[in-house]
Amino acid sequence: MQGRIIKGIAGFYYVYDVVEFAVYECKAKGIFRKEKIKPLVGDLVEYEVLDKEEGTGNITKILPRKSELIRPAVANIDQALVVFAVTKPKPHFNLLDRFLVMMERQEMSVVICFNKQDLAGEEETAELKATYESCGYRVIFTSAYKEENIQEIKAVLKGKITAVAGPSGVGKSSLINCLQENINMETGSISRKIERGKHTTRHSELIPVDEDSYIMDTPGFSSLYTNDFEKEELKSYFPEFREYEGTCRFLGCNHVSEPGCMVKNALEEGNIHRTRYDDYLEMYRELEQKEKRRY
């Protein structure tokens, strides 16, 4: 039988069988320990049922992974949905840009969702849309409270495993609840079996939103690591800089203080957004300081 690990805790792996709409509490066979392979949330696995009534089984095989993240340790994530509020609270652009850098480093596609659009004016939404769509990101505005554009989010999730991230207070939990609203009762009972409560999850967990779509809410995506690489790499994680690659006066220009920099020229002409560039500069300086401390 085949299923997907939707949660792992204390050596137990909860395997969701999409055919049966059932979850089995499984242990991994000893062969995995011997081969130093650890099952991960998101893994597609083969398993055998030990007790159908009790819902227990053993994982016998882990199918090949198409991707693997280290922080958090999850497999087969297709994309990330980052959720911020348009207002109340206003977007923390530096936090958003750090998240985007982290995803660019992992070569993962990102969809940006700005929630609470019902509380914002047209000017606010237009500015956010212009800033991030010009960088190549898809931007969707939603209202979990009024259930606006939820179907557009569902279309983005279709057939994928999506990591959902965002700071507290932006309506992320309400959005996830909206996405789960229309799933059938059998799938809905899954969350009860693995004791998913209203509290903040402390373990990576996949939540089925239909038979071939999952979302993952995890605390790991709140801890953003943007200082474990060289400062020269940073520019490649800002997509809007790429069209100017090779056009600056100096080869290897970092777009900071070098003369003849075409990125800074684009900034002055309004073709690159100031908030994005300022966040780039802040991250660059942090990496620079870390490098100095190292030596």
Where are these regions (language model features)?
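Structural detector for short beta-strands of small beta-barrel domains
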Residues: 1-9
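Helix-rich effector regions associated with P-loop NTPase G domains
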Residues: 11, 35-53, 63-79, 102, ...
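SH3/SH3-like beta-barrel fold
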Residues: 13-18, 26, 47
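Beta-strand/loop nucleic-acid-binding surfaces
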Residues: 22-37
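Short, Lys/Arg- and Gly-enriched loop/turn segments at beta-strand edges
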Residues: 52-62, 90-92
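Phosphate-binding glycine-rich loops and their immediate beta-loop-alpha structural context
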Residues: 87-136
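Canonical P-loop GTPase G-domain recognition
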Residues: 118-170
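A conserved segment at the C-terminal end of the G1
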Residues: 172-188
